[in-house]
């Protein structure tokens, strides 16, 4: 009320038959207090008047007193009277609580008890009260529970607050407001459990304003009302509601949260505020600085209480509660009330009245939200998301939830160009988060991609669609996510992408769907019937990418190439083809240890740290038409040089091959070359037929013996001093048909009639070209060969 404005006139309260005539109930137009007026004597008072003694019913007759005789009877009567004044015996828990806190009747309330409006007092036992509770699924557990307030006018709120309520467009209280308001006005502890978007914020703010008006504390001595919230977004949202509905009543408020400078927050505290909305972490920091006093707090609210306790704020909350006097009123407003949290909450509340909207023990989703659960693979998520976004009306607000901050940023960048999206998560600074939320509220950025940091308590109007791109890590978070739409009586739509890795939540998700009368997909029911296992039968011998391993799942989660498919990329491609890698000739090439050891020089250049070699390799790949042939020829020449360097190793390999008759491991594909018949007359070291590679002693099939002295052709090879720098690393197509062993024999027995290209044609030389200038990078093994003279 501004200065110079006449105070509002009082108004009559609803008729109360229990009032003696001619008393009438009045409501103060300025403060909203209920008081009583006698029009005959013009006397007003806050205490409810009692009827005259002549109108009181006669008391019941007392039983005749027992006969008394002697001193012992008088002592016995004295003990009986003292016992009758002693309160009933209670358990140790009640005694411990009363030692720290006084009873509800002796809390920090004003000297005159503020009664409920007469309409609520007389309707507590009215049949319409039970009908109202049954219609709105209200369950109340506690003592002396008043009837719900069905209209704002009967709540006893001052005209300033009523004007703000009417300006906000509220026609009647929500069920949680209607039942929790009269309980809170009686200075009782409250546990209010209701679905998201049910108006819990005003459920504790308006009684808190009435509490402030009754006490008339000095704001400079500290706040009177303290509200704790788990996240910065929820805290700022509560502050906005407190400022909007408390401005006309001259109620000052401030918000304390991390991620913002402390200077402005400390200045607000120094000026004095009535209401403090804070996160536990920042409030503890300011308490350690001794810049705030909570000795005057008598109205404590824990919004999203289960969330704060689940997030690990229990030590901070207990530390804050120790700074608050025990004579206080505590209220917990939340959407869920798990059994694990009830034990902790018993230490913070005294004889609370529990008000539940809907089911008591199970999670309940808003029935006004249409839930669509789609079983989908990770690689199909982005394409389906784009289809949903294109089907929405232009300018519709869509909220998308992801589980990781990295995915949140990447998905926002992908959608920004087409739809205009922004991201919000815990790594964003407070200014960035406020800017993103401002753009989302105004419609400048109609799509918001968020993590669970924005899932609890975020109240943004006109959110049409909520999309769970990644299923949350708990079914409680799912209820809070979809609760961002369908608020304040509106309807909404929720889409949920459900993958095989989320199968452990299938049974709980079905309960949520059935509780809200939503359709349950058949695939989801089948998954739940299998005990939460995946929906597809997995092949034991499938590759990792086929089984949906970690790499393929990660790549598909981030959209794959171009953000559309879940291609696993180069790493997964090599893994998936490791066991089944087929060449052009149809034979299987095992990419095991042997292949990695015999990688050609071009492959080694590929992993070279030198940018120059990498560029050369990229140019050679564009000019080479037969990379596999170049690799085969280079592999065999390298094997022959490694055998020829060590005479001891050569003799050792010869003895091993002669004694055992077993084939040496091929440096190439590791396969044995078998011939249809064996001829022991052939000499192993001097082959006349290059197609025969049998062992001379036992006639068993063996490998080509590469342990020999270098030939003149080898001495003039690429590592010899006479090398002219122009050579190739591939063999002719005709020699390649018989495999790598034949290529080795061609290099061992060259054709005299062939041109001096070391057994290769010009076509082969062009195909195996490595560099534009024909140079080959130095190799330490080549230098060792040159120093040894090229032969042993």
Swiss-Prot record:
It comes from Oryza sativa subsp. japonica (Rice). Residues 181-355 form the Helicase ATP-binding domain. PANTHER family: ATP-DEPENDENT RNA HELICASE DBP3. Residues 52-68 have a biased composition (Pro residues). PROSITE patterns: DEAD_ATP_HELICASE, HELICASE_ATP_BIND_1, HELICASE_CTER, Q_MOTIF, WW_DOMAIN_1, WW_DOMAIN_2. InterPro entries: DEAD/DEAH_box_helicase_dom, Helicase_ATP-bd, Helicase_C-like, P-loop_NTPase, RNA-helicase_DEAD-box_CS, RNA_helicase_DEAD_Q_motif, WW_dom, WW_dom_sf. A motif (Q motif) lies at residues 150-178. Residues 764-777 have a biased composition (Acidic residues). It comes from the Eukaryota. A motif (DEAD box) lies at residues 303-306. GO terms for cellular component: nucleus. Its EC number is 3.6.4.13. The Q motif is unique to and characteristic of the DEAD box family of RNA helicases and controls ATP binding and hydrolysis. Residues 725-739 have a biased composition (Polar residues). Residues 1-25, 44-118, 523-792 are annotated as: Disordered. ATP-dependent RNA helicase involved nonsense-mediated mRNA decay and ribosome biogenesis through rRNA processing. Residues 17-51 form the WW domain. Residues 70-80, 88-108, 543-560, 572-588, 668-708 have a biased composition (Basic and acidic residues). This is DEAD-box ATP-dependent RNA helicase 40. It holds the Pfam family DEAD. GO terms for molecular function: ATP binding; ATP hydrolysis activity; mRNA binding; RNA helicase activity. One of its GO terms (biological process) is rRNA processing. It is found in: Nucleus. Residues 384-528 form the Helicase C-terminal domain. Disulfide bonds: none annotated.
């Amino acid at each position: 009320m501004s200065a110079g404005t006449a105070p509002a006139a009082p108004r009559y309260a609803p008729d109360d038959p229990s009032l003696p005539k001619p008393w009438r109930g009045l409501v103060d137009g300025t403060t909203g207090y209920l008081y009583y007026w006698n029009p005959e004597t013009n006397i007003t008072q806050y205490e409810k008047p009692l009827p005259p003694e002549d109108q009181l019913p006669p008391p019941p007759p007392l039983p005749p007193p027992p006969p008394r005789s002697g001193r012992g009877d008088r002592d016995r009567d004295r003990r009986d009277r003292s016992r009758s004044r002693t309160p009933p015996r209670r358990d140790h828990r009640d005694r411990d609580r009363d030692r720290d806190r006084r009873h509800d009747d002796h809390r920090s309330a004003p000297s005159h008890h503020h009664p409920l409006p007469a309409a609520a007092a007389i309707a507590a036992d009215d049949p319409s009260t039970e009908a109202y509770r049954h219609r709105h699924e209200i369950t109340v557990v506690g003592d002396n529970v008043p009837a719900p307030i069905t209209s704002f006018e009967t709540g006893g709120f001052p005209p300033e607050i009523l004007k703000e309520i009417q300006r906000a467009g509220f026609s009647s209280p929500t069920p949680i407001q209607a039942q929790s308001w009269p309980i809170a006005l009686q200075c009782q502890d409250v546990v209010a459990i209701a679905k998201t978007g049910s108006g819990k914020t005003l459920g504790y703010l308006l009684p808190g304003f009435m509490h402030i008006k009754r006490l008339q504390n000095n704001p400079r001595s500290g706040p009177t009302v303290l509200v704790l919230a788990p996240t910065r977004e929820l805290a700022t949202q509560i502050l906005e509601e407190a400022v909007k509905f408390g401005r006309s009543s001259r109620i000052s408020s401030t918000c304390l949260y991390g991620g913002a400078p402390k200077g402005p927050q400390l200045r607000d505290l120094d000026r004095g505020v009535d209401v403090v909305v804070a996160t536990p972490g920042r409030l503890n920091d300011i308490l350690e600085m001794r810049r705030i006093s909570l000795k005057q707090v008598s109205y404590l609210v824990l919004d999203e209480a289960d969330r704060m306790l689940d997030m690990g704020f229990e030590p901070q909350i207990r530390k804050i509660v120790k700074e608050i006097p025990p004579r206080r009123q505590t209220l917990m407003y939340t959407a869920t009330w798990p059994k694990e949290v009830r034990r902790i909450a018993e230490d913070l509340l005294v004889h609370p009245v529990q008000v539940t909207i809907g089911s008591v023990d199970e999670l309940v989703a808003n029935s006004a939200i249409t839930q669509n659960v789609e079983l989908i693979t990770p690689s199909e998520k982005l394409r389906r998301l784009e289809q949903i976004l294109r089907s929405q009306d232009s300018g519709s607000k869509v909220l998308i939830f992801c589980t990781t901050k990295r995915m949140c940023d990447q998905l926002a960048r992908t959608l920004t160009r087409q739809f205009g999206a922004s991201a919000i998560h815990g790594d964003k600074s407070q200014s960035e988060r406020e800017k993103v939320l401002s753009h989302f509220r105004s419609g400048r950025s109609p799509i918001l991609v968020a993590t669970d940091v924005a899932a609890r308590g975020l109240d943004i109007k006109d959110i049409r669609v909520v999309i769970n791109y990644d299923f949350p890590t708990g079914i409680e978070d799912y209820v809070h996510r979809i609760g961002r739409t369908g608020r304040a009586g509106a309807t909404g739509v929720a889409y949920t992408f459900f993958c095989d890795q989320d199968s452990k939540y299938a049974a709980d998700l079905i309960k949520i769907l059935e509780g809200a009368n939503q359709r349950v997909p058949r695939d989801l029911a089948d998954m739940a019937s299998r005990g939460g296992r995946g929906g597809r039968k997995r092949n034991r011998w499938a590759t990792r990418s086929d089984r949906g391993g970690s790499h393929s799942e990660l790549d598909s989660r981030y959209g794959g190439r171009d953000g559309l498919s879940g291609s696993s990329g180069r790493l997964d491609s090599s893994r998936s083809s490791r066991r089944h890698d087929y060449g052009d000739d149809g034979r299987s090439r095992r990419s095991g240890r042997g292949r990695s050891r015999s990688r050609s020089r071009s492959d080694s250049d590929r992993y070279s740290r030198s940018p120059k070699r990498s560029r050369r390799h990229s140019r050679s790949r564009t000019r080479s038409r037969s990379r596999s042939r170049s690799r085969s020829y280079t592999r065999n020449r390298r094997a022959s040089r490694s055998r020829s360097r060590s005479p001891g190793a050569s003799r050792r390999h010869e003895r091993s091959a002669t004694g055992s008759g077993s084939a040496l491991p091929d440096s190439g594909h590791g396969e044995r070359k078998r011939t249809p018949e064996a001829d022991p007359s052939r000499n192993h070291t001097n082959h006349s037929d290059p197609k025969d590679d049998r062992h001379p002693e036992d006639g068993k099939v063996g490998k080509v013996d590469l342990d020999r002295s270098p030939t003149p052709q080898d001495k003039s090879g690429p590592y010899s001093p006479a090398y002219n720098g122009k050579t190739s690393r591939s063999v002719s197509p005709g020699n390649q048909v018989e495999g790598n062993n034949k290529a080795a024999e061609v290099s061992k027995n060259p054709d005299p009639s062939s041109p001096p290209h070391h057994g290769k044609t010009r076509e082969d030389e062009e195909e195996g070209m490595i560099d534009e200038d024909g140079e080959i990078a130095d190799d330490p093994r080549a230098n060792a060969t040159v120093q040894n003279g090229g032969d042993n």
